[in-house]
Amino acid sequence: MLLLKISVYAVVIFFVGLFVFGFLSNDPARNPNRRDME
């Protein structure tokens, strides 16, 4: 049961980090070469 809980937390943290990374990467001021991804 502990392993399952750790796995769930790992997946949640992974998706949150992916969302934050994607949000920062889509910022035109930080990465203007990604305008075609919008």
From Swiss-Prot:
Stretches that traverse the bilayer: 1-21
Superkingdom as given in the UniProt entry: Bacteria
InterPro entries linked to this entry: PSII_PsbI, PSII_PsbI_sf
Signal peptide: none
Swiss-Prot/TrEMBL GO biological process terms: photosynthesis
Location (main, coarse): membrane
Database matches in SUPFAM superfamilies: Photosystem II reaction center protein I, PsbI
Keyword set, alphabetical order: Membrane, Photosynthesis, Photosystem II, Reaction center, Thylakoid, Transmembrane, Transmembrane helix
One GO CC term on file: plasma membrane-derived thylakoid membrane
Bilayer topology: Single-pass membrane protein
Localization terms from the record: Cellular thylakoid membrane
Entry's family note: Belongs to the PsbI family.
Subunit structure: PSII is composed of 1 copy each of membrane proteins PsbA, PsbB, PsbC, PsbD, PsbE, PsbF, PsbH, PsbI, PsbJ, PsbK, PsbL, PsbM, PsbT, PsbX, PsbY, PsbZ, Psb30/Ycf12, peripheral proteins PsbO, CyanoQ (PsbQ), PsbU, PsbV and a large number of cofactors. It forms dimeric complexes.
Function statement: One of the components of the core complex of photosystem II (PSII), required for its stability and/or assembly. PSII is a light-driven water:plastoquinone oxidoreductase that uses light energy to abstract electrons from H(2)O, generating O(2) and a proton gradient subsequently used for ATP formation. It consists of a core antenna complex that captures photons, and an electron transfer chain that converts photonic excitation into a charge separation.
Protein's recorded name: Photosystem II reaction center protein I
Species this chain originates from: Synechococcus sp. (strain JA-3-3Ab) (Cyanobacteria bacterium Yellowstone A-Prime)
Gene symbol of the encoding locus: psbI
